[in-house]
């Protein structure tokens, strides 16, 4: 609201009462003072209406902004509502009775088409796999050209292939003894005599006949390992600081050592002083895998096959220090120097015998 301003000027008086006529200078000064008061009053009257107009304009702008915000929010709500209605109609349109823009008949036709399509695809894949399996023998690998030379493994099991134990502390080596006893249960003499046959040494045990015919296996008795059999020394030498470690080749179907020469085992210090290992006894004494255990015909027909072993008896090894040992296979066609694979034709482990 615009305020009504009233002039506070004094009522006009006769000229004779306002100014003294006998003093001209005083008359002029009084006249000028009145003029200044009138000018200030007029300026004050002009400023107040301008401020009121600015306040009114600001109020009008605020009202317009509120109206715009209200209208924008209403438009947003209505847009979301329209979108929701469109989605609902797309999911289910009660007027056209369609779901996802398709009628029930259309959906039925699509399901039938896809059913027959995927059924045909599955039938073709099944037929291809069946035809492929007809060409593959379950008893003998079809392609053996890329089969690597045999790898090796050792027993007892040792974490990171580090054999660390103290001779005077049975708790440090007892688990090695338990591991060896468990591993050699299948090599017991009575079991081998019952399940397998006694084959002549030094020649391949070739068995003719159909590939699905059960094959016989040659005996490998636990007693062949002598001092490392656990029969004479139940602790396998660990109680005296002369440990036994067993080595065997992995099975490869159809593998035969080339030239009819048995594969031999040789162990030495990998790095360091060769005198750290002064004596090793091998069992069997030939330190080799006899030819009578080859070829291997696969687990389906060669059910009772027993892998041959070579035992290394470390009878004189330096004590109280880690000794890296490398055991290699030696023979024609044997690869034992693959840098990226420590178990192809060789095995590396550490002996640390404390007293």
From Swiss-Prot:
Membrane topology reported for the UniProt record: Single-pass type II membrane protein
GO terms, biological process: potassium ion transport; regulation of DNA-templated transcription; sodium ion transport
Predominant location category: nucleus
Statement: the UniProt record of this protein carries the keyword Magnesium: no
Acidic residues bias locations: 50-68
Transmembrane domains' residue ranges: 109-129
InterPro entries linked to this entry: Na/K_ATPase_sub_beta (IPR000402), Na/K_ATPase_sub_beta_sf (IPR038702)
Keywords: Membrane, Nucleus, Signal-anchor, Transcription, Transcription regulation, Transmembrane, Transmembrane helix
PROSITE patterns noted in UniProt: ATPASE_NA_K_BETA_1, ATPASE_NA_K_BETA_2
Chain spans, region Disordered: 33-77
Pfam families: Na_K-ATPase
Annotated disulfide bonds: none
Ranges per topology, Perinuclear space: 130-355
Compartments, record wording: Nucleus inner membrane
GO cellular component, one term: nuclear inner membrane
Self-association state and partner proteins as the record states: Associates with a SMAD7-transcriptional complex. Interacts with SNW1 and TOR1AIP1. Does not associate with known Na,K-ATPase alpha-subunits.
The family this protein is said to belong to: Belongs to the X(+)/potassium ATPases subunit beta family.
Functional description taken from the UniProt entry: May act as a transcriptional coregulator during muscle development through its interaction with SNW1. Has lost its ancestral function as a Na,K-ATPase beta-subunit.
Name the record gives this protein: Protein ATP1B4
Name of the gene encoding the protein in the UniProt record: ATP1B4
């Amino acid at each position: 609201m615009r305020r009504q301003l009233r002039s506070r000027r004094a009522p006009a008086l006769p000229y004779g009462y306002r100014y003294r006529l006998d003093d001209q200078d005083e008359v002029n000064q009084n006249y000028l003072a009145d003029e200044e008061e009138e000018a200030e009053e007029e300026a004050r009257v002009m400023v107040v209406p301008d401020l009121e107009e600015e306040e009114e304009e600001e109020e009008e702008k605020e009202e317009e902004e509120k109206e715009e915000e209200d209208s924008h929010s209403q438009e947003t709500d209505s847009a979301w509502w329209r979108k929701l209605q469109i989605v609902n109609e797309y999911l289910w349109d009660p007027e056209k009775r369609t779901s996802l823009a398709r009628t029930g008949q259309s959906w039925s036709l699509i399901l039938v088409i896809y059913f027959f399509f995927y059924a045909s695809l599955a039938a073709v894949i099944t037929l291809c796999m069946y035809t492929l399996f007809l060409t593959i023998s379950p008893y003998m690998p079809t392609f053996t050209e890329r089969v690597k030379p045999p790898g090796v493994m050792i027993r007892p099991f040792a974490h990171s292939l580090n054999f660390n134990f103290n001779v005077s502390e049975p708790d440090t080596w007892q688990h090695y003894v338990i591991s060896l006893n468990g591993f050699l249960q299948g090599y017991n003499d009575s079991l081998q005599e019952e399940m397998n046959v006694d084959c002549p040494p030094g020649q391949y045990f070739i068995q003719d006949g159909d590939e699905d015919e059960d094959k016989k296996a040659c005996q490998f008795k636990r007693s062949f390992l002598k001092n490392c059999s656990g029969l004479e020394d139940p602790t396998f030498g660990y109680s005296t600081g002369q440990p036994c470690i067993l080595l065997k080749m992995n099975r490869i179907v159809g593998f035969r050592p080339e030239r009819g020469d048995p594969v031999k085992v040789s162990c030495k210090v990998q790095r360091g002083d060769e005198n750290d290992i002064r004596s090793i006894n091998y069992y069997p004494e030939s330190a080799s895998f006899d030819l009578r255990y080859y070829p291997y015909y696969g687990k389906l027909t060669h059910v009772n096959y027993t892998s041959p072993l070579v035992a290394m008896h470390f009878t004189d090894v330096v004590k109280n220090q880690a000794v890296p040992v490398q055991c290699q296979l030696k023979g024609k066609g044997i690869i034992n120097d693959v840098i990226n694979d420590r178990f192809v034709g060789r095995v590396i482990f550490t002996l640390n015998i404390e007293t």
